[in-house]
């Protein structure tokens, strides 16, 4: 997507954490690079995991920016396809259905920030120095 800023270590950390967590679980996983404010709106139970350089937590919702394996993309291709075929609320409805069956995690604190409407539930990730991140990405 074109409205994210990524920390320089984002890909490296996500790949290292993917390898660590998926090998511990013995299965492929989904990973979201952002820690969204909407993840704090419900009193949803979560698990905290140790990643490569930070903690991660299990989540049940993402937007459309995530990392996963080709195996899981192929397995859930119908969900991704249905997500684009018609309008529904939320937009990610069919993607989020996947997380009822599969493991999805997001970092604490964020490796990417979604530069969206700060007043939306997606908002800006907490505890980020946005000026520094912007300057690093010039």
Feature map (PLM): residue ranges:
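Conserved catalytic core of nucleotide-sugar-dependent glycosyltransferases
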Residues: 5-79
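C-terminal catalytic/acceptor-binding lobe
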Residues: 70-138
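Short acidic donor-binding/metal-coordinating loop in glycosyltransferase active sites
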Residues: 1-2
